[in-house]
Design a protein with these regions (language model features):
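Short, acidic/hydrophobic/Gly-rich beta-strand patch recurrent on exposed beta strands
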Residues: 17-22, 88-89, 100
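Short alpha-helical "recognition helix" segments of helix-turn-helix
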Residues: 108
Length: 135
């Protein structure tokens, strides 16, 4: 498993960046706000989660271990896959934690692809469990 990557931003696309690491280009999916802040040619480092599918491997990048741990917790919720978890992280750790702890369906379901039922599952399964992993 690839636990982290350090390299140069080679290219940015809609939901991923290609990071050049010693001549190999890795496609790394990132939060939309983080992706928007990257500049081509800049050296970056991310903690990563390698997601294996039938025919494909995907890398998801995070600025901190805390953010990665929150990603893992989100992925334990039935119906939440890696792309949805990444978009939820775009809310920011504190805003997401507060929305879950205060049962704020409106904020959680404001994320594209997150319906009311999924938001309710996220709240039910994660309420009170996010305080120790501050990003």
């Amino acid at each position: 498993m690839i636990a982290s990557i350090k390299g140069t931003v080679l290219h940015k696309d809609i939901n991923f960046a290609i990071i050049d690491n010693n001549g190999l280009g890795y496609r790394v999916f990132l939060r939309p706000d983080l992706l928007a802040s990257l500049k081509d040619g800049v050296t970056v480092q991310f903690f990563t989660h390698e997601y294996l599918r039938e025919n494909e491997r995907e890398l998801y990048g995070f600025e901190s271990i805390g953010e990665l741990k929150l990603f893992w917790k989100l992925m334990t919720v039935s119906g939440v896959g890696p792309k949805m978890a990444l978009h939820l992280l775009g809310l920011g750790y504190e805003k997401l934690r507060k929305a879950i702890d205060t049962e704020n369906l409106a904020i959680i379901s404001s994320i594209s692809g997150v319906g009311k039922k999924t938001a309710q599952k996220i709240i039910l399964e994660l309420r009170g469990k996010l305080k120790s992993d501050i990003a």
